[in-house]
């Protein structure tokens, strides 16, 4: 007999037990959050904190309920999106109505730290190209747009409590630029113990490790609570272009802006064709007649390989999103934005010991199903250029791109080709290690694949072509000499160039 992969329905006695356990756990959490609120000493901070704890409790309660009911997607009901739910960028009208820029605001998600690349402070201040960091490039792009079209497109940064203070200092340097930069903070939620499901922090001003920013799905609530959404509407802004702060391909695109206004869509998600490097990326589906974002975490184990298939799920979410501001206001005020919860388990240092914690997060892309006329636009790969690792950093610093008004533009000789696949080993994980080992970026215009592992340094004026693999064993050292040209080679062993 064939199995369908569906779970057995829960018996009534199981439901009753789960329901009681859920109520007890929720009640304990509510009491703990009330106690936390009592520790706020500054009356100006009380309202915001209580509001955040209420929002956290709503999320926590929903997490418990969904966990108890075992609600999951029915894989058999998943369909590919229809032709009006995903449209090709090339089919959009090419007329450029610059007047529409008066309806636009740009938002960069700026809550992340640079710790994964070995840096202290906000990730957005890592230098990526010609002395510019992520924020510098975003400012230059929008400033150029404002000058060219005599516009006044504002830039908003959604910070977290981890990045806010540093970002405020950094943006002072843009005061003389032709751009308005505004910042606001996303929520600060308490981490919870994995075993007891109670909050880690014991007071409002407990250490930073006790708290977490709850993912970019918090954007809608934070926009409204900060007053920034009403301020944008008062300026006549209608559309918010949202992107990850580390995606260097996410520039303002008038074609998509015009298309959104023409169609009246409340939400547009930029998609791009999957490659084997993107098999874990979220994808758009049609589920019971509505457009939804399907993330790998929601996929039953037996269907993960199918989800990764490039044939069935051709596109993935770039997290470049165009969202109608009035629609956000209406949905938030009606408490109507309910998105999938992503439980994130971590081990953190707290006090003198390591503890296992849970943080409940949400993603902004998952809200697509609540907006009218929502659809995906399949954009060129050039609009997705994230910098997550030093391997990505090598790519964006290279001669593959040139800088034009803050935007990275691909060298025309690479048109039609995918970017080279670059894999740098653990010696290059931190920016400091990357910079000391590759002080001069090699020419990679003709490169297809690069792998470097071990104690390797690269000299000045090096060219890499085709497939280049450099493997240095433990205890050995490889110095690639100045001016070397490596083409379709594997370099192993021990190679040190002595200065004479």
UniProtKB/Swiss-Prot annotation:
Keywords: Cell wall, Magnesium, Metal-binding, Nucleotidyltransferase, Secreted, Transferase. Substrate binds at residues 111-112, 216, 244-246. One of its GO terms (molecular function) is UTP:glucose-1-phosphate uridylyltransferase activity. Induction: Expression is up-regulated during oropharyngeal candidiasis (OPC) infection and during stationary phase. Repressed by HOG1, BCR1 and hydrogen peroxide. Its EC number is 2.7.7.9. PROSITE patterns: INTEIN_N_TER. It catalyses: alpha-D-glucose 1-phosphate + UTP + H(+) = UDP-alpha-D-glucose + diphosphate. One of its GO terms (biological process) is trehalose biosynthetic process. It is found in: Secreted, Cell wall. Mg(2+) binds at residues 123, 246. The active site is at 388. Pfam families: UDPGP. CDD domains: UGPase_euk (cd00897). It is an enzyme of class 2 (transferase). Residues 449-500 are annotated as: Oligomerization. UTP binds at residues 109-112, 123, 186, 215, 246, 388. One of its GO terms (cellular component) is plasma membrane. Present with 17200 molecules/cell in log phase SD medium. Homooctamer. Plays a central role as a glucosyl donor in cellular metabolic pathways. Belongs to the UDPGP type 1 family. This is UTP--glucose-1-phosphate uridylyltransferase.
